[in-house]
C-alpha cells in the first residue's frame, strides 16, 4: 500500500474532511469499500504466500519509503512492528501545519488491513499504535 510521499498529508486531510462532512460511520464504510475494491489481489497473495509473504510484503513497502520495522513470522502468523512509519516521516517532512496524522489516520490501517486479512483467511489484530509513527499488528491464520 505504499503511496507517493507527498500524498500522505493529503490522506489525513481527506479523512478529516470525509468524517466532518459525512460522519465517522461513513468514513469507516469508505475504508471498507477501499479494501474490497482495491485489495482482493493482495488478499489472495497473503492467502497463498502465508505469513512469510505477509512479512516480506510489509518489509518491502516500509523500507521502500525509508521507514523502519521489525517482522516475525511463523507458520501461523506474521507480526509487524513499524518503528518509524513512512506515513509519519513524510507528513512531518512536507507538513504545512494541516496534515499531521491523527488516530483516525491509523485506524484506516486497522480497518483496511483487517478487511484484507478477512479476505485472506486471517484474523487481524492491532497491537498498538500512536500518532508518532509507531504501529504493531499481527495477522494470524484462522482455524480451519
Please annotate each region the language model reported.
Residues 1-107, 118, 123-136, 141-144:
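N-terminal accessory segment detector
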Amino acid at each position: 500500500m505504499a503511496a507517493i510521499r507527498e500524498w500522505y498529508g493529503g490522506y489525513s486531510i481527506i479523512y478529516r474532511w470525509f468524517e466532518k462532512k459525512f460522519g465517522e460511520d461513513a468514513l469507516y464504510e469508505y475504508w471498507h469499500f477501499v479494501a474490497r475494491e482495491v485489495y482482493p489481489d493482495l488478499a489472495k497473495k497473503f492467502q497463498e504466500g502465508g505469513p512469510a509473504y505477509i512479512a516480506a510484503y510489509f518489509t518491502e513497502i516500509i523500507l521502500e519509503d525509508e521507514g523502519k520495522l521489525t517482522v516475525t513470522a511463523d507458520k501461523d502468523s506474521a507480526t509487524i512492528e513499524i518503528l518509524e512509519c513512512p506515513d509519519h516521516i513524510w507528513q512531518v517532512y512536507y507538513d504545512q501545519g494541516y496534515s499531521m496524522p491523527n488516530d483516525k489516520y491509523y485506524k484506516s490501517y486497522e480497518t483496511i488491513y483487517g478487511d484484507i486479512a478477512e479476505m485472506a483467511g486471517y484474523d487481524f489484530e492491532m497491537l498498538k499504535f500512536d500518532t508518532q509513527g509507531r504501529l504493531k499488528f499481527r495477522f494470524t491464520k484462522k482455524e480451519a
